[in-house]
């Protein structure tokens, strides 16, 4: 009996160490490299300084931004929740926020935490192309998918109640004399593992409420307009921290 107790105690210690390692993994807390700008450090101050509401057709919020600063359930520091009351019931586009700066090619790091099962948000590249954040779904509309187009090559989501990270390398669409010659491409690392490798993005999905060009030719009418990094509000407690972007020239 004593040996069984010792074995059980050791297993709990190892399990605890595994959890600790998971939340102190190298993909979390990544510092912004030279030339990058930190857009969200988890504080309301950084939120209001660097972000604005995206005022699309469904916009229903009012300034100032109502995404609240809350306490990080893991580390105790400040984080920002996407649970804006204007987006209650899954009204994407009603209270989404976007960086004031706009980009063409860029690299970005985004850390997120889903508080409850079914939590839903999303990261939009150039305020066009969505990388899904959705607990409980691994389809083309599920976690880490390039929405409606590309499944992740592996399941790297750590689950509800843990921090996760996207590292993004984005190449904007190319144009010559106003004509689209190359579609946008993205490489995505999820919790340190490459899950999308320079995949081509065909269009904007979700209609005009989803972002720039969503209403152009059913989302296929991509224009040569830069856009910000956008975070989606759907009335869920999805927390964000440590978001930085580096423009690539």
For each feature predicted by the language model, list its residue ranges.
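Bacterial N-terminal signal peptides that target proteins for export
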Residues: 1-7
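Carbohydrate-interacting regions of secretory-pathway proteins
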Residues: 19-249
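Bacterial N-terminal signal peptides
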Residues: 7-16
């Amino acid at each position: 009996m004593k040996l069984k107790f010792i074995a059980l105690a050791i297993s709990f210690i190892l399990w605890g160490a595994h959890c600790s390692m998971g939340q102190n993994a190298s993909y979390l807390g990544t510092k912004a490299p030279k030339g990058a700008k930190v857009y969200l450090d988890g504080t309301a101050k950084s939120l209001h300084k660097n972000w604005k509401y995206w005022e699309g057709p469904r916009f229903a919020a009012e300034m100032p931004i109502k995404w609240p600063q809350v306490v990080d359930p893991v580390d105790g520091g400040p984080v920002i929740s996407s649970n804006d009351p204007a987006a209650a019931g899954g009204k994407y586009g009603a209270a989404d926020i976007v960086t004031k700066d706009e980009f063409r090619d860029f690299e970005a790091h985004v850390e997120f935490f889903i508080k409850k099962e079914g939590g839903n948000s999303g990261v939009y590249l150039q305020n066009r192309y969505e990388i899904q954040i959705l607990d409980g779904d691994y389809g083309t509309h599920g976690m880490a998918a390039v929405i409606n187009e590309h499944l992740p090559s592996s399941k790297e989501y750590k689950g509800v109640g843990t921090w996760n990270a996207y590292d993004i390398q984005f190449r904007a669409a190319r144009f010559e004399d106003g004509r689209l010659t190359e579609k946008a491409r993205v490489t995505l690392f999820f919790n340190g593992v490459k899950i999308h490798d320079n995949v081509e993005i065909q269009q904007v999905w979700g209609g005009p409420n989803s972002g720039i060009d969503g209403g152009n030719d059913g989302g296929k009418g991509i224009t040569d307009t830069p856009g910000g990094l956008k975070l989606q509000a759907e009335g869920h407690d999805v927390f964000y921290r440590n978001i930085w972007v580096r423009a690539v020239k």
